[in-house]
């Protein structure tokens, strides 16, 4: 009588299990990466939307945003929590940082986009350091009746690394 000694798994079966685990892991990492990118995109969109709405609410009665800048907007609570100060020195605040690490600036402008002059009754939001797909998503948003918003400037010719 021949004894059969087949109590364990074969090496081929174990390699198959490892391959399945590897495929599932790669899928999970890709899914997580896409989810984080969507989260960051939504953070930027929400921040811009809240900033526009807050400026509209705060300056609606005045019908003039002369002198509005990032520091004044931050001090007045116009800039939401989605955007963080770019440095610890809030007295010298010139921009805030969005979720992709780029900058956001709020500036008073004339209707033709000049940042100086006595008739700066409009404002612009300047966003730099966005990936191309996020810039496109923001550019295609319907901003509705955004009051005195002249423009949302995206990247100003700069791209974030790798995009």
Residue ranges and their predicted role:
Residues 33-68, 72:
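Membrane-proximal N-terminal amphipathic helix
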Residues 1-47:
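N-terminal single-pass transmembrane signal-anchor helix
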């Amino acid at each position: 009588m021949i004894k059969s000694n087949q109590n364990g798994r074969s090496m081929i079966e174990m390699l198959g299990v490892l391959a399945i685990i590897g495929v599932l892991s790669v899928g999970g990492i890709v899914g997580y990466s896409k989810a984080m990118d969507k989260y960051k995109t939504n953070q930027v969109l929400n921040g811009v939307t809240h900033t526009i709405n807050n400026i509209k609410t705060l300056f609606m009665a005045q019908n003039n945003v002369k002198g509005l800048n990032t520091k004044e907007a931050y001090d007045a609570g116009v800039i939401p929590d989605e955007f963080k100060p770019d440095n610890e020195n809030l007295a010298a605040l010139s921009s805030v940082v969005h979720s992709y690490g780029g900058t956001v600036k709020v500036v008073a402008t004339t209707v033709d986009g000049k940042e100086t002059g006595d008739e700066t009754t409009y404002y612009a939001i300047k966003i730099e350091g966005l990936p191309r797909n996020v810039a496109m998503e923001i550019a295609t948003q319907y901003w509705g009746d955004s009051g005195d918003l002249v423009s949302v400037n995206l990247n100003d010719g700069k791209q974030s690394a790798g995009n």
